[in-house]
């Protein structure tokens, strides 16, 4: 089901519809039968992060975040059309459950936070975007205390350091994570892919690439993608260890840096097969 939620069947370029556009009763302006709700988009984002699909999770998260300056500044609206990037007239412009679905995917998804105040434990299972070198989350509540978390990439590891609360126990669900002194050291994948999601112009229909699935093997990364037939798309590649000699099937890896050189990103370009509407493509990286 996660593949379908990430696909154009459910996902527009501005969020996730509440049902498939292939059912007989689909209506893109119906409140419950085809409109796009940021509430559902946020739920899908959290589910994708928990299923270790951070590219789709980040895309849906940033769609919700982008809505905070689309209508009333700082607020997220209640619902939009399921066919065109347009707010529906009966949508509440400041809908609390929509705004909550900006925060929840960030904290519970991207940063992977889980609380157990009874034993003063914070579980941290982050899946930061490949283009992020550092991040800080401030004033995280834990029982009667608050703490800050600093995230810093160091080669093939992500270092998570807490400050501000005594006696906090950090743990993680990510494989290989361990405490080193006062910090949590989390192994990073050898290869990561970055995406820069953007909202389309107002009134647009759905045209952007969709990342349906991502599968990390010992020395491979396979992406299942969906895009408009014959279109070209670009992602970015990050290598967290030297000398990997990454090869790509059905894609071309550029030699020049993408963006700031210190991020270590290189462009990945690929073309979808010819066809009407959305078609699928699989891209595999090996090293």
Go through each PLM region and give its residues:
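Broad hydrophobic/π-residue packing in well-ordered secondary structure
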Residues: 37-39, 142, 152-153
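Active-site core of glycosidic bond-cleaving carbohydrate-active enzymes
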Residues: 1-118, 159, 164-171, 183-185
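Non-catalytic C-terminal accessory domains or segments of carbohydrate-active enzymes
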Residues: 119, 123-150, 158-287
